[in-house]
Amino acid sequence: MQCFAEMTPADLSLGLNGGLAALIGADGQLLAGAAPAPEEKHVLLPLPLGERALIFGAGHIARSLVPLLKTINFRPVVYDCRPECVNQVNFPDADQVIVGDFDHIADSLALLPDDYIVIMTNAHSHDFEVELQALQADHAYVGVIGSAKKTASVNARLRERGVTDDRLAVVHTPIGTAIKAVTPAEIAVSIAGEMIYVRALRREGGQEAHHGCPMH
């Protein structure tokens, strides 16, 4: 459906007298179904949209991360340059799989302000190019996998390309929460945990998150 593909808000119109359901965009435009008759009573139910998570790199961690993100109401999109890796067979839970050039993401995918961007490709050079493009604008979350040594090396190259320290400071790297994760599944859990926390902060206006959980 258009609203889910473009991440635009929409309402579900349900006729109280047995009329057909319709999908109404935020601007009042009919997106799907039959428009309710003027005299018909109906109720509008807002449709929640999960945040879009862009996973750059279709490796083992991504295979563990995508189904996990799906269960916590993210909308995972997997992007890789290798068609044998990025496909619906390997990622049945992904909302979308994209085969594209890491150096020219905009040719295949628009990066949006509310996107959660996870960078863990099969090469440091690809990670660098994706991070460089991601830092050209603000996003909800940018996380990059890698050691402290790799991060320092990449940051030095990014500075050479004009990326400021203020921009570098928004990147979560090494990615994930500090839970001593080792296996791909454990690393996926640590990444998902960090994304949940950032999402909670954003929903609370950037203030410290209060989860109502005895563990926090």
PLM regions and their residue ranges:
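Short amphipathic alpha-helix with an adjacent loop that forms part of the alpha/beta core around
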Residues: 103-113
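Segments forming oxygen-rich coordination pockets for charged ligands
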Residues: 1-81, 85-95, 112-116, 150, ...
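Adenosine-phosphate binding glycine-rich loop
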Residues: 145-216
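Short phosphate-binding/catalytic loops that engage adenosine nucleotides
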Residues: 74, 139, 163
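ADP-ribose/adenylate-binding Rossmann-like module
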Residues: 79, 116, 121, 132-157
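Short glycine-rich, flexible loops that bind phosphorylated cofactors or substrates
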Residues: 125-127
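Conserved SAM-binding strand-loop segment of SAM-dependent methyltransferases
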Residues: 95-101
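Short amphipathic alpha-helical segments
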Residues: 66-68, 90-91, 110-111, 129-133, ...
